A protein has these predicted regions:
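Terminal, non-globular segments
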Residues: 1-173
């Protein structure tokens, strides 16, 4: 990733983080809502190479660690987002049916979002972080899955156009 692309991507994810903190967190959506930086990063990674996916995960994970609503240790989201975005980029990079089909991309991003939240809870428990009752965690993860399936089709065209403008013709949705 060139320095220009990395800088512009960082500014995009900073803007997404500010929108999440100032608007979406204030909405009090049922089921816990959704994380816009998580969705945008996973969608961005699905359109990218694994290297760009890992860098995307680093940028978005760093901003997610800075969030006031983050209950994990510093670096917790960063590590998980690097791994999740790399995995999504790896799955989507070599398979043109994933990159060329919006429905497959939506399913990939939605399932990766839920798996990332489950991994956050599991690694958080290993780190000694208190998340509350099992039922509340399950409601939050299921609520997030619901919102992700609703929001991902809405943001996919925007993210695809932005990714294509920044990285050229690698995104083909």
């Amino acid at each position: 990733m060139l320095a220009r692309q990395f800088s512009i991507s960082s500014l995009v994810f900073l803007l997404i983080f500010l929108i999440q903190e100032s608007v979406i967190n204030q909405l009090r959506l049922p089921g816990g809502g959704f994380s816009l930086p998580l969705l945008i990063a996973l969608t961005w990674a699905a359109l990218s190479t694994p290297t760009v996916g890992a860098l995307t995960g680093f940028i978005s994970g760093f901003f997610m660690d800075l969030s006031q609503s983050s209950s994990g240790a510093m670096g917790h989201w960063t590590l998980l987002m690097i791994l999740a975005c790399y995995a999504v980029a790896f799955l989507g990079f070599g398979n043109d049916s994933v990159r060329g089909n919006p429905i497959t991309n939506i399913l990939l991003v939605s399932s990766a979002s839920v798996l990332t939240l489950v991994a956050f809870v599991i690694t958080g428990v290993l780190l000694g972080i208190s998340f509350g009752s099992f039922g509340r965690v399950l409601i939050t993860i299921m609520g997030n899955a619901f919102w992700v399936v609703l929001v991902t089709p809405l943001i996919l065209p925007f993210v695809t156009r932005l990714h294509r403008a920044l990285f050229g013709n690698q995104a083909r949705i």
